[in-house]
Amino acid sequence: IRGDFGKSYIDNKSVGDKMLEMFPYSFFLVIISIILAYLISIPLGIYSAYKKNRLFDNGVSVLVFMLYSLPSFFVATWLLYQFSNPDNLLWFPSNGVKNPATYNNDWSWYDMDSIKHQAPYFVLPIIAFTYSSFAFTNRIMRVSMIDVLGADYIRTARAKGLSERHVILKHGLRNGLLPIITMFSNVFPAAIGGSVILETIFGIPGMGGAVYEAILGIDIPMIVAVFTLTGALTVTGYLISDVLYAIVDPRISYSKK
């Protein structure tokens, strides 16, 4: 018994060390993209529900369905063609997470030089990760808020003379967020799988490619480590969701009576 995940069958490196190198990249991309998607899609979903079937709602719906229908590999390739192409706009690097010729240190969350150097490499991947999450989350938020705004207690709140802002944000938003919180429980496990396609296109050394290689190479230690970490993160995600349920919905309480 070693007390760890052993060594990879592919390169004979420690599985734990390999995961420590790759996991932060996938986790960072997933977390940042989810935060951005929530910050954009939740307000838009609320306002679309309030303006149901009007010009704003119809316009947002068309845009969201267009974004949701675009394959991630197409968006990633288009972003590289437009913004990492000397013939168009060479604004961002096209591949990898750093330039070994000018910066050869490891990624660090606390080193500002590391963050400044590597930040441009993450802009396009974050956009590619965010757009599909934004489209799906926006639709869920809109449908949830439409159901909530048609409830009896919302009509009662309006009959009391409360402002629309107070009715929506104070009475409607809490219940409208419940499906979004349920979705949030899957964020952490998603950081393990990452996105094989997007990480490959942008040259991100994350977990997606590692999982794919481990399966093809029948790398048992790596596969066991991935499933173990996925299980731990799944439990963590559900725990955080349960806590958020109790915060958002006053009907839920975990205290003993």
Segments predicted by a language model, with ranges:
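Hydrophobic, well-ordered secondary-structure segments
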Residues: L44, F56, V60-V64, A76
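Membrane-water interface segments at the C-terminal ends of transmembrane alpha-helices
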Residues: L63-G96, A128-T130, F134
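Alpha-helical transmembrane segments of integral membrane proteins
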Residues: F23-F28, I32-F56, S72, A101-K257
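Phosphate-coordinating loops and pocket residues in cytosolic domains that bind phosphorylated ligands
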Residues: I10-D11, S61, S94, L169, ...
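Short, hydrophobic secondary-structure boundary micro-motifs
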Residues: F5-Y9, V75-A76, W91-N95, A157, ...
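Short membrane-interfacial helix/loop motifs at transmembrane-helix boundaries
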Residues: I1-D17
